[in-house]
């Protein structure tokens, strides 16, 4: 039986007790303390409309080593046409991720309550957005959660070819500079594998998670990065 979380308790079952599909628990709420505790333990929420909150720790897990990102010549060229900003348009990035149509996906897992909850994390300097602009218009980007030296990528969107991949490349460059260890890409996808991400076991991921640099201070990333 999948454990149910109570709203007054912030503890989670151990990820290794997850179901074969990677479900750790269900229920609870999305208050900041619970979300932070979840990410610190390699767990994240992911659920559909009208479903209860479901907490996951998949096995295998997809991660991106910062030095493994594959920056093709064509992407390097595309990157030069965009302007990049950090943490200046967080809610609109989330809303675009919510509304973008995706292949083989009916509807979105990004509910309005998810946007509200992660906006609170953003105000706390824990959730971040990377944004690509073309002629002053937001055309792509991504958002995620920082846990010490780990960045947990949540979702990305693109309205113009290569806009989200370019934002991802800019993110990786800055994570290296800031002393981050790696990116948690969560659920394996061919798109991110093609960019250099790899599947690892849950045990390996949790071991890496517990060794990340926890001296990185949470703060807003309000930077302006003009072209590349």
From Swiss-Prot:
Its main location: cytoplasm. GO terms for molecular function: leucyl-tRNA--protein transferase activity. Transmembrane segments: none annotated. GO terms for cellular component: cytoplasm. Its EC number is 2.3.2.6. Keywords: Acyltransferase, Cytoplasm, Transferase. InterPro entries: Acyl_CoA_acyltransferase (IPR016181), Leu/Phe-tRNA_Trfase (IPR004616), Leu/Phe-tRNA_Trfase_C (IPR042203), Leu/Phe-tRNA_Trfase_N (IPR042221). Gene3D superfamilies: Leucyl/phenylalanyl-tRNA-protein transferase, C-terminal domain, Leucyl/phenylalanyl-tRNA-protein transferase, N-terminal domain. The keyword Transferase applies. It catalyses: N-terminal L-lysyl-[protein] + L-leucyl-tRNA(Leu) = N-terminal L-leucyl-L-lysyl-[protein] + tRNA(Leu) + H(+); N-terminal L-arginyl-[protein] + L-leucyl-tRNA(Leu) = N-terminal L-leucyl-L-arginyl-[protein] + tRNA(Leu) + H(+); L-phenylalanyl-tRNA(Phe) + an N-terminal L-alpha-aminoacyl-[protein] = an N-terminal L-phenylalanyl-L-alpha-aminoacyl-[protein] + tRNA(Phe). One of its GO terms (biological process) is protein catabolic process. It is found in: Cytoplasm. Functions in the N-end rule pathway of protein degradation where it conjugates Leu, Phe and, less efficiently, Met from aminoacyl-tRNAs to the N-termini of proteins containing an N-terminal arginine or lysine. Belongs to the L/F-transferase family. This is Leucyl/phenylalanyl-tRNA--protein transferase. It comes from Sulfurimonas denitrificans (strain ATCC 33889 / DSM 1251) (Thiomicrospira denitrificans (strain ATCC 33889 / DSM 1251)). The gene is aat.
């Amino acid at each position: 039986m999948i454990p149910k979380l109570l709203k007054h308790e912030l503890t989670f079952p151990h990820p290794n007790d997850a179901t074969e599909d990677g479900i750790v628990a269900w229920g609870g709420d999305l208050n900041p303390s619970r979300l932070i505790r979840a990410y610190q333990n390699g767990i994240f929420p992911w659920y559909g409309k009208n479903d209860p909150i479901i907490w996951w720790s998949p096995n295998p897990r997809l991660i991106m080593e910062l030095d493994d990102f594959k920056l093709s010549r064509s992407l390097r060229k595309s990157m030069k046409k965009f302007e990049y900003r950090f943490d200046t348009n967080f809610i609109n990035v989330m809303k675009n991720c919510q509304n973008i149509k995706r292949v083989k996906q009916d509807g979105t897992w990004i509910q309005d309550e998810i946007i509200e909850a992660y906006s609170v994390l953003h105000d706390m300097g824990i959730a971040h957005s990377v944004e690509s602009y073309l002629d002053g218009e937001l055309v792509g980007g991504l958002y995620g959660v920082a846990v010490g030296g780990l960045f947990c990528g949540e979702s990305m969107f693109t309205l113009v070819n290569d806009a989200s991949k370019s934002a991802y490349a800019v993110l990786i460059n800055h994570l290296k500079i800031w002393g981050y260890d790696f990116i948690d890409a969560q659920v394996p996808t061919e798109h991110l594998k093609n960019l250099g991400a790899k599947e690892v076991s849950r045990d390996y991921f949790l071991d890496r998670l517990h060794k990340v640099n926890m001296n990185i201070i949470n703060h807003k990333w309000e930077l302006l990065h003009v072209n590349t």
